[in-house]
Every structure is written in structure tokens, then in C-alpha cells.
Amino acid sequence: MLVVLGLLTSFLSFLYVIAPSIRKFFAGGVCRTDVQLFGKVVVITGANTGIGKETARELARRGARVYIACRDVLKGESAASEIQADTKNSQVLVRKLDLSDTKSIRAFAEGFLAEEKQLHILINNAGVMLCPYSKTADGFETHLAVNHLGHFLLTHLLLGRLKESAPARVVNLSSVAHHLGKIRFHDLQGDKYYNLGFAYCHSKLANVLFTRELAKRLKGTGVTTYAVHPGIVRSKLVRHSFLLCLLWRLFSPFLKTTWEGAQTSLHCALAEGLEPLSGKYFSDCKKTWVSPRARNNKTAERLWNVSCELLGIRWE
């Protein structure tokens, strides 16, 4: 037993010694474009923390007027103040948005449209992970509501402004976890069977399928859309799982920082020449492969129609 513990300790010590080299290998791609955003308007959901916050920081640094749309306004204001001080850009604004509540989503959109006549970039960044089973006030399972339906509705409500401001982009944060996902139309809300891990995977697959179908419907409008896997990032997304929090802490030297995790979102929001790749899935700042289920056009169209029915909207 002592020998095993000794070997394990030696192995972990070795890993931590070579951690900088491993970190450099897993850091991933970097957004290389020097595009400036003076006069441009951006909305980022969940930008009060993590990847979203770093994305907002970089877009503000480039001169954009950035709206941090988040549930916790106090944390949002704290993030905005930090970004303003760091970038010397005072145009970082915070607005209340609870993606688990369709009334909040509609209120945010109504306020934004009254306030702004342009919208050039929408980044659907917010998300939840590994939540115990629960339903929102609208009767939707939490992962489905926040990660998919909330952003589906928000994009629907803001799309007119995006079209008016074209060229414009919609970036949807997904995950490599979509490979384990399946759209279970017979039990979309998890009433018959629920697993908090798979619920997250299903919602991330929904993000990729939404992006695929949205791109098809936006052809010729000047608005393009991209799905993004940010990488395995040191963030608070795993806060609902004690085991993952422990693993994240143990392996934190090997995980991406939030700055690194933001790079692919920035690439898809800013890089020149991406228009022909609308609807595609990106990781480490390049197009990458998706699961067979994520390439199913019939599933994408059906999910679109079911989402419209659940939300009571008609998407022209």
C-alpha cells in the first residue's frame, strides 16, 4: 500500500512539474484577428463571469458597446466596472436577463430594442450544467430551458435588429459533450427518465442543431451563425457537482483559463472570411467535426418546430 501511495505521489508530482508544458499543449487556438469594433453593438449572455466575462473584456477592448445580459445584476455590475477600468471603455452596460424565465427574456429584448437601433454580434454564452432535476416557471426542464430554449427565444426576438445591422453574427456556446447527447422527443423534459449529466449533453446537442438550422434559414440575410466548443475550462459551470469541483481543482493546472476558453467565441465573432462556414461547429478557433446526430437535418428541423411550439412563437 505504501509503495502504491509512493508511486501515486511521485506521478502527481511529475505531472505538476511538467504542467507548464502540458498547459501550453492544451491551451488551444488564439483569435488572431485585429478587427476593431468602434460603433458596433454586442450582447453577451452570462458575461458576468467565466468565459463570457473574458469575451466581453476583449470586445470592449476593441471598442464595442457591450451589453452584459445576466441574471445576477450585482455581479454583472461588478464585472462591468472591472472591464471598464481595464479597457478604458465606459460603454459596458448591464441588463437583467434570466434565461430560465421567458417573461424575463421578453422584457430584456423589449428594453434592448427600445434602447438600441443596431446589434452586430449576439453571443449566447450563458449556461448551466449538472443541475438536479427541476422545472422552470414555464414548465421546462432546467438544462433545456436555459441552454437551449432561452437562447432560441432571445435570438428570435433580436433577429430583426441583427438583420437590420448586417453583416452580423450569432455565436452559440455548445460543448464537446454534444457527442453524448440525443434529442429524446418522446421525453424532452425528462419526465420519464432524468440523468443530470445526459441532460446537459442533450442541451449541448440542441445548441449545435439550432445553429445548423438557423444558418439554413438565414441564408442571404447577411447574418451568420456558429457553434463553439470553448474547451475544458476552469470555470464555475461545474459548481453543482462536488466530484467535478474536486476534479477541476485537482487538474486545474491542465485546464484552459477563461481567457483561453474565450478565444474560439472571439474567433467566430470577429474573424474575417467565416461567412461560408455559417452553421458549422468550431473548437480551438477552427472548424471541427460534430457527432452524426448533430448532422441530422431532419432532427434539426424537428427540434426547431418543437421549440417554436413550446415557446408559442412563429419564426418566419
From Swiss-Prot:
Keywords: Lipid metabolism, NADP, Oxidoreductase, Sensory transduction, Vision. Expressed in the retina. One of its GO terms (cellular component) is photoreceptor inner segment. Substrate binds at S175. Pfam families: adh_short. GO terms for biological process: cellular detoxification of aldehyde; retinol metabolic process; visual perception. SUPFAM superfamilies: NAD(P)-binding Rossmann-fold domains. It is an enzyme of class 1 (oxidoreductase). Retinoids dehydrogenase/reductase with a clear preference for NADP. Displays high activity towards 9-cis, 11-cis and all-trans-retinal. Shows very weak activity towards 13-cis-retinol. Also exhibits activity, albeit with lower affinity than for retinaldehydes, towards lipid peroxidation products (C9 aldehydes) such as 4-hydroxynonenal and trans-2-nonenal. May play an important function in photoreceptor cells to detoxify 4-hydroxynonenal and potentially other toxic aldehyde products resulting from lipid peroxidation. Has no dehydrogenase activity towards steroids. Belongs to the short-chain dehydrogenases/reductases (SDR) family. Shows clear specificity for the pro-S hydrogen on C4 of NADPH and the pro-R hydrogen on C15 of retinols. This is Retinol dehydrogenase 12. It comes from Bos taurus.
